[in-house]
């Protein structure tokens, strides 16, 4: 495999003067070069906030710049800041930064009142880097030769993690040199997965949980190279870049499996090899061949532009715009570029830079929305004169271009909105489980639903059924025997009524018998639908009032009406009297009492038959007038068979 290494060979003292004259058009030339070096300060790496301001530190001061380069406010510190690390936003209008192996907390001014930076963490050892999780309000710090420390915002230690792990007698990390193995990189946080990624000096990459020292997976890259950079995609992927080998790996953030790998152009051996991931889940990285390489989640590669000029390089990492959909890229054209292959490395050399080109690119569509070239002067930047006190290289200039949204047609979004957009791409593709025939599963679920509904109905029926009065302290078999007896009686009464109706004679005795049988059948049906039903008990007093209707009496005459079996209607009107009413009421009550006796059904039939016979004889011996005075039957019944 052919690797690349960029070696920049400028003319003596030319590099400094080029950037000084290119980015300071309004500053006159100084006579003494030594005095010029003493008058300027070097800014640390840049952080662009959601408010559009640029945050950086220099020497013992922390600065907040407006997008035009003017200083919004500054805070003096007691320690000199480390320019290799950018400030980190920690929430609640606070910043954390590294200064002389100490982490300081800078609080934004309130109502014009500034507060001095406070010491957040001082291990007394070398700090390799730190990261902040705003969602969990925690800070994760890598201390050289010690491990990974987790602190909350109240400076309370949560836990400590080390690369040496032994579980059940097995080593999970540091397999080659267990004694001298240490973490040697700064931690990076995957906000979507809630994970921390950190590597050791043996080329192993760890994935830890934010909540504790739970190691999710360990991937060994020692066979590829021990020097690599890690960038969380916040989209279900982790990007591992090997600058010397010019390789890009995409790992599953859940399992650590390698999904794909690509070879790109030569990269600078600095942090400029870190890719930037936009909200469309495209990872972009600049190369020394002047090309912007963009990868989709599935590994599709776009080169922007397709045919890059051979005298251009991209030596600083692109910056994400405020919308999250585009990136700002800086290309530098050099005079006399030469590349040579020596053994496994490609060396690129150049004489002097000529032009810097800033562009706004959307990797997903390969569209260039804005581009501006600067040579000797940069009138288009319109930067404030406050920046004349600092060294303004193309890294700083690109940061202010991105902060001012130069040529950007997209709406700016907050960091939370951009993170939510990218996290939506983190689909659980690793859960590849065979679930069988979906159609069969749907039918099975439907069948289960029907069974559950039927079971619920059965439970409800049983709950209502066992609350019946006839089942309280009585055997269930007695209840069933009574139901069968009542059904048999109902059928016998129907047969008797049919036989009497089919007889040609319609005398008074037959009418009385039919009336009694109809009333008896109604009582049987009432019991089957209430006390001996399979449902809840019904209040019989209400049903009686609802079923019986008082007849209309217009004299002493009687009225009899018969119809055929298919559509039967019987209407009986007789003259009421006090004596007959009391006698009939007593007979009805006696009938109900005997009918409720569940232990002597034969006696019930015998009493009813004897009473019916005695009543029929009394009606035959008496005259029509006597019978009408002693009998009181108020019945109107209509039924259809």
Curated annotation (Swiss-Prot):
Coarse class of the protein's main subcellular location: membrane
Region called Disordered, residue ranges: 570-627
SUPFAM superfamilies: Quinoprotein alcohol dehydrogenase-like
Function: Required for micropylar pollen tube guidance. Plays a role during early embryo patterning.
Biased composition regions of type Basic and acidic residues, renumbered to the chain: 584-593
Taxonomic superkingdom: Eukaryota
Organism expressing this protein natively: Arabidopsis thaliana
Gene name tied to this protein: GEX3
UniProt keyword terms in alphabetical order: Cell membrane, Membrane, Signal, Transmembrane, Transmembrane helix
Ranges of compositional bias, category Acidic residues: 594-603
Tissue: Expressed in mature siliques and in pollen, mainly in the sperm cells. Detected in the egg cell within the female gametophyte.
UniProt cross-references to InterPro entries, sorted A to Z: GEX3-like, Quinoprotein_ADH-like_sf, WD40/YVTN_repeat-like_dom_sf
Subcellular location(s) of the protein: Cell membrane
Name of the protein described by the UniProt record: Protein GAMETE EXPRESSED 3
Membrane-crossing segments per the record: 441-461
Topology within the bilayer: Single-pass membrane protein
Signal peptide per UniProt: 1-29
One GO CC annotation: secretory vesicle
Biological-process GO terms, alphabetical: embryo development ending in seed dormancy; pollen tube guidance
